[in-house]
C-alpha cells in the first residue's frame, strides 16, 4: 500500500461516488462556529537544514538542570547498549506477533521479559506489558472485581500516587465500581491501620498496597496483605521495580502474598522523555491468569519437537472475545519492554541491587545533610527507599523557584496534591547523583533559607 497523498483525480472520483461536489460539501453538516477556518499561525515550509537549526536553538532553551525530582518517573543511568540493541531493525517495530512462525525472536524476548518480571515480583505469571503504571493499576482493579464477583468496591490508600488514583477513578467509574480512599497517618506517612479498620465489616474486592508509597515511605505490607485476605479481599501491590531488587517481593507479603502486582516500568532502562512513552507491568498468581489483561507469551514445542514461543490464552483478548475481552490492550508497549528486558539482562540481579542500594544511600545522605539546616526536617518518621518528604519553615514554592533559577530542580511541591502538607517537598536522589551534587543542593538551600 503506497502512502502518498490523494491525487485530484482520486478526490473527484471519491466525491462523485458519495454524491458530493466538493470537500466543503462533504463536511457542511459541521456547524460553522465549530470550524477552525484557516490555520493562520502555521508558518511557511522550511528546509531540513533550517528545521535542524530551529530545533537546536529551541533545545538550548531547555537548559540542563540538576534534578532531584522523582514522584513516579526516575532519572537512572541507562547503559548505552540498551537502546543501541533496542533500535536494531529486528526489534524496532510495533508489530503484534500474531504469526508465531514469523516472530520467534520477538516472542522469545517477551517470554524472557515475563520470566524476569514474574521473578522480580515473586509471582507465578506476568503479561507482556500494559500502557503505563497508572493504567496497569486500573486494570488490576478491574481484574479484582471480575475475580471477586460479589463486590464492586476497591480500597485505595491516599498514599498511592495521586495521579494513579485519578486514573483508576476515571477508568472504573463508568463500570459501577466504587473507589474508597483510606487516610494516611500524618506522623508516619503510612496507611493508617486504625483508619483501615473502620472498613472491617464492609465487603471490598481488593485493597491496593503501595511499596514504597508516593511519599517514598515503606508501608507495613505484611500487615496490610493479611488484613485484605482476612476480609476475603484481594491484595493488589503497586510497586517500584527498582525497589524490588532490595525489598521483599509482593508474592511473599504476609501469609499468602499479594494476589496481583503492578507498577511503572520506566526505571528499567526507559528515558524520562518528558513523560513517555513508558510501560506498565503486571504479574499475578496462577489462579488469576484468565482474568489478566494483555498479551501472554507461552513456551511450547512444534510438530517437529522443537522449542518455540507463541501467544497463549488468546481467548481473553479482544481479537477473539470482542466486548467480553479482559481489556482492550493492543500492541501495547513492546518497544519499551524490549529496552527493559535488555536493561535487566545487562545489569542482572546484582546490578539491579546495586542501583537500588546506591539510590537509597544517596537519598539517605541527602536527607541527613538537609536536616542539618535550620528550618528543614523530615515530615514523616518512617523508613524510606529513594524518596523522602521534607518539611520547610518557609514557603516551599518560593524555594523551588529560587533553586530552579540556579539550575537545580529541588523536588515536587506536595501541597498541590495534599493541601494539608503545606511547605513540603518530595525529594529523590537516584544512583546518578554523586557527593558533589548533594553538596550543591545543600549549599544552595542553605543560602536560600538564610536569605
UniProtKB/Swiss-Prot annotation:
Q: Which UniProt keywords apply?
A: Oxidoreductase
**Which Enzyme Commission number(s) are on file for it?**
1.4.4.2
Query: A GO biological process this protein is involved in?
Result: nucleoside metabolic process
Q: Which GO terms describe its molecular function?
A: glycine dehydrogenase (decarboxylating) activity
Q: SUPFAM superfamilies, from UniProt?
A: PLP-dependent transferases
Family of the protein in this entry: Belongs to the GcvP family. N-terminal subunit subfamily.
| Function according to Swiss-Prot or TrEMBL | The glycine cleavage system catalyzes the degradation of glycine. The P protein binds the alpha-amino group of glycine through its pyridoxal phosphate cofactor; CO(2) is released and the remaining methylamine moiety is then transferred to the lipoamide cofactor of the H protein.
Under the heading PANTHER family, the entry gives: GLYCINE CLEAVAGE SYSTEM P-PROTEIN, GLYCINE DEHYDROGENASE (DECARBOXYLATING)
Q: What is this protein called?
A: Probable glycine dehydrogenase (decarboxylating) subunit 1
Look up and give the organism this protein is from: Nitrosomonas eutropha (strain DSM 101675 / C91 / Nm57)
UniProt lineage? Bacteria, Pseudomonadati, Pseudomonadota, Betaproteobacteria, Nitrosomonadales
